[in-house]
From Swiss-Prot:
Domain of life where this protein originates: Eukaryota
Domain comment quoted from the record: Organized into two domains: an N-terminal catalytic domain and a C-terminal arabinose-binding domain (ABD).
Name of the protein this chain belongs to: Probable alpha-L-arabinofuranosidase B
Keyword terms, alphabetized: Carbohydrate metabolism, Disulfide bond, Glycoprotein, Glycosidase, Hydrolase, Polysaccharide degradation, Secreted, Signal, Xylan degradation
Disulfide pairings: 21-31, 81-86, 176-177, 401-439
Gene: abfB
Cellular compartment(s): Secreted
Species: Aspergillus awamori (Black koji mold)
Length: 499
């Protein structure tokens, strides 16, 4: 129950100027960690929200709100990252506890980056506007993860805590585990009840809810719970919102899942009650590390997008969470533009010419299923001209972006598979559609366009030894070489050789 003082404070905190953590503070459940790349989560916060590292020279900078309590300075990011790539290296904790999130280390599973670390996220994969002002979220492909194994002030053992996250309800998969919250400090599986984290996805390996998913569930380690029982719980609905608020809280023999459209409306309670009646979950044995985008022992096959989230000390009341939801809705999250530079038009047929000096007579083509570059001109055979011509269609996974259908093999599209670009028939699956969707941006070398993978926005169409790859600007693969990267990922859009 709230005291008269706290009810007054909560009412004041619900004003437009207050941030989510001001509201939690007024409810006697203060934030112990607060993370966002889009905005300040306290009305007075004016420090760094996140750190960027750019690919051209590996230098770093920090991005702060435009004003105290305001929206991130996206223009500072755009200036710093112009004509190169940028990664998000640190997501800073706004609570003052120093619970910053950095590149997740190896654990029970290795990550795909050097020394088993997880990948870092692209800085431009999740553009949004908040109240009309541009910002960027954290688009996390499989293999991407952030962590802090030495967090301060987070719940341990059976201590009470709450948390929420604003996520993309359309970006998910069924792999383990797109989480945000409390996890093991060793990055290994230390047993049931050692985690308490928000999960969003459509995995049915452990728990699941009504419909086909995705669902908000709670990762308590060795199980995803959608309600009191293992497996199916009908009270946990499928999520269809583009922006979703996921709220979880847990204390001594109680926990809850709540959710809402982050753009409108109020929170609904999907479960509130006793802890699962299975060994290890009552009492809990939480360890207090913080994870984002991965499971507790660095299981890193999941995908999702994160915009903001916090963890609290104490079990927040429904009233407090409801006020936080009002604040999130008032932020007015809207999808931003994924494309820039020379435009494509769905239905047009194009040829794409290499701009790397010494290779400018070569065009993107294919030989059977291999996507490559070949020398093509007006005197080339009809067969080669058709192999070097592509029909532009609306992106199979995202309507802002595009997919490229072969002129000579209708129904087959350029897609990435193990980061090679292949020409494969569209099998109608979600996976294929995501693999075959690419977002054009102004060419990194200033000549034409660069084509960025929608599902792996650190990766671009790149020709390397005359073969096409989905390559990053530096990385563990030979085709990720930084040498000539900007030239190798830039292509001129030309009238097709064939139609």
């Amino acid at each position: 129950m709230f005291s008269r003082r706290n009810l007054l404070a909560l009412g004041l905190a619900a004003t437009v100027s207050a941030g989510p953590c001001d509201i939690y503070e007024a409810g006697d459940t203060p934030c112990v960690a607060a993370h966002s790349t889009t905005r300040a989560l306290y009305s007075s916060f004016s420090g760094a929200l996140y750190q960027l590292q750019r690919g051209s020279d590996d230098t770093t900078t920090t991005i702060s709100p435009l004003t105290a309590g305001g929206i991130a300075d996206a223009s500072a990011q755009d200036t710093f990252c112009a004509n190169t790539t940028c990664l998000i290296t640190i997501i800073y904790d706004q609570s003052g506890n120093g619970n910053h999130l950095t590149q997740a280390p190896p654990g029970g599973f290795d990550g795909p980056d050097t020394d088993g670390y997880d990948n870092l996220a692209s800085a431009i994969g999740a553009p949004v506007t908040l109240n009309g002002q541009k910002a960027y979220g954290v688009f996390m492909s499989p293999g991407t993860g952030y962590r802090n194994n030495e967090a301060t002030g987070t719940a341990t053992g059976d201590e009470a805590e709450g948390m929420y996250a604003v996520l993309d309800g359309t970006h998910y998969n069924d792999a383990c585990c797109f989480d945000y919250g409390n996890a093991e400090t060793s990055s290994t599986d230390t047993g049931a009840g050692h985690m308490e984290a928000i999960y969003l996805g459509n995995s049915t390996t452990w728990g699941y809810g009504a419909g086909d998913g995705p669902w908000i569930m709670v990762d308590m380690e060795n199980n995803l719970f959608s309600g009191a029982d293992e497996g199916y719980n009908s009270g946990d609905p499928s999520i269809s919102y583009r922006f979703v608020t996921a709220a979880v809280k847990g204390g001594a023999d109680k926990w809850a899942i709540r959710g809402a459209n982050a753009a409108s409306g109020s929170l609904s309670t999907y479960y509130s009650g006793a802890r699962p009646d299975y060994s290890g979950y009552n009492p809990m044995s939480k360890e207090g590390a913080i994870i984002l985008g991965i499971g507790g022992y660095n299981s890193n096959g999941a995908q999702g997008t994160f915009y903001e989230g916090v963890m609290t000390s104490g079990y927040p009341s429904d009233d407090t969470e409801n006020s936080v939801q009002e604040n999130i809705v008032a932020a007015k999250y809207v999808v931003g533009s994924l494309v820039s530079g020379p435009s494509f038009t769905s239905g047009e047929v194009v040829s794409l010419r290499v701009t790397t000096p010494g290779y400018t007579t070569r065009y993107i083509a294919h030989t059977d299923t291999t996507v490559n570059t070949q020398v093509v001109d007006d005197d080339s055979s009809t067969t080669l001209k058709e192999e070097a011509s592509w029909t532009v269609v609306t992106g199979l996974a995202n309507s802002q972006c595009f997919s490229f259908e072969s002129v000579d093999t209708p129904g087959s599209y350029i897609r990435h598979y193990n980061f090679e670009l292949l020409l494969n028939a569209n099998d109608g699956t979600k996976q294929f559609h995501e693999d075959a969707t690419f977002c054009p941006q102004a060419a990194l070398n200033g000549e034409g366009t660069s084509l960025r993978s929608w599902s792996y926005p650190t990766r671009y169409f790149r020709h390397y030894e005359n073969v096409l790859y989905a390559a990053s600007n530096g990385g563990v693969q030979t085709f990720d070489s930084k040498t000539s990267f900007n030239n190798d990922v830039s292509f001129e859009i030309e009238t097709a050789f064939a139609s």
